[in-house]
């Protein structure tokens, strides 16, 4: 029943928020282990660009779904251990050339938040698509891990890239772009846009 599901989700959300608030006030720190953006001052252009950022997030989500199905169908045809060897070789060779796509993306996102100006906007957008492709390849071919942090990293990278293409390196614009693209991407992949 849909109404009971909504009620249960509401209770879970309230309980999670309450427990988080209680533990944060008791022990301090909150989400200190996870990189967070600084507060931004939004301008009129940011509101106009929301549509562009949403389209960027949807493009990544569409690419995620395509590569998820494609890598899954290819992985079914590759014998057991060879699929993991192929995934490891692909990841190793590509990350030798582009180290930003290695690992889950949790630590790399924090680093990217401080070094994004060293990249061309097109490179950041390319890294986002490559991260999505490699994540699906590794998961479908049997390597351990999940898609949550790699998808967040890809969204941040794509948001930075799009914002830099349009607004330059301005910190406020790129932070807003990264947040909107990432929220759109996660909402589309999880199929729960209001949960993000």
Model regions: which residues?
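Alpha-helical transmembrane segments and immediately membrane-proximal extracytoplasmic
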Residues: 1-196
